[in-house]
Amino acid sequence: MLFLLAGFEINPQTITGREGKRGLKTWLATLALAFTLVMSLYHASFGELSIDALALAIALTTTAIGALMPILKERGIFTRKTGESVLAYGMWGELGPVIAMALLLSTRAPWITVIILFTFITLAVLVAVLGQRAAKAEHQIFLVLSRGRNTTSQTFVRVTMFLLIGLVAISAIFDLDIVLGAFAAGFILRYIVPENDHVLEEKLNAIGYGFLIPLFFVVSGAKIEVTAVLNQPLLLIGFIAMLLLVRAVPIFIALHTDKTPEVKALGWRNQVTVSLYCTTALPLIVAVTSVAVSAGAMSSSLASVLVSAGALTVLVMPLLALLTYQESKDSSHQ
């Protein structure tokens, strides 16, 4: 549900526009930096890296954009330039690691995974386009669903749940991370639901942020081995430091060297703010470490430390970002 809401909130132009493309290049740079760092830690070449090393490198490039959405909205940053930059850079920290997981942590041949990924993405785009056309043409099926959306039938909510479960199931069947299916469901909804229609969004927010998303964090926390974390405090701090080095520093450099007037107008403090927000990472760390633990390549104690570090970033990074944020230099896009 966390990733469905993230996909639903994102305007495709945000990640395909100029700053979005810069965000992609920056994420690729963070990926290269992460692998360089991990290879030096493991004293191995790229081809010699084990699954746990690959998982660690991917985890260093993640951004918990779904967890950041409500924070940005509550602080009034979501509709401002700072929020737009967080989405442009942070969204690739959500999408990129999912694709990297599929390609690098899969037991299949890479070319087979590429074909499956391409097929899945094509299917999602096709459903989105057909759904959008049906909505614009006021097709009979869409009209029936519209009439029941605010009644006890709650047709839009039911279709959303069906879409979410269906795409997550397809992802699982083809051994793709279920995050991809959930995000695709949000992407499809974005195209089908009219832009100014916030009724469904409010209902999904109530279901997600009121129950399912807190449940996800509770379950993630319940899996943490507290003794393992307490016994390895330096590893915990070290991983957070690596996240800052790999994720925050490249994003700050990309923003600081951007010559666009709007980005330059943010000032270095708001550029630091964007970088700190984008270093918030938990959900995909849970996903990456789960794959490595299931494969027997990572111990549950190490996974617990990494997940705990991710949880700390969700608490600490937004707090630090609040301290560096300068509203007077942040233009509104509302």
Question: Where are these predicted regions, by residue range?
Answer:
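Structural signal for the N-terminal portions of transmembrane helices
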Residues: 1, 23, 86-90, 107-122, ...
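Membrane-interface junctions of multi-pass transporters
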Residues: 1-22, 140-239
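C-terminal ends of transmembrane helices
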Residues: 4-19, 66-79, 129-143, 188-202, ...
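Short helical (or helix-break) motifs at transmembrane helix termini and adjacent helical loops
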Residues: 9, 33-38, 58-85, 91-99, ...
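Entry/N-cap segments of selected transmembrane alpha helices
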Residues: 10-46, 51-57, 110-126, 224-258, ...
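Membrane-interface alpha-helices at helix entry/exit sites of multi-pass transporters
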Residues: 19, 78-92, 115-116, 198-201, ...
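Hydrophobic alpha-helical transmembrane segments in multi-pass integral membrane proteins
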Residues: 35-43, 94-108, 162-176, 215-230, ...
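Juxtamembrane and boundary regions of transmembrane helices in multi-pass small-molecule transporters
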Residues: 44, 112-140, 255-266, 309-334
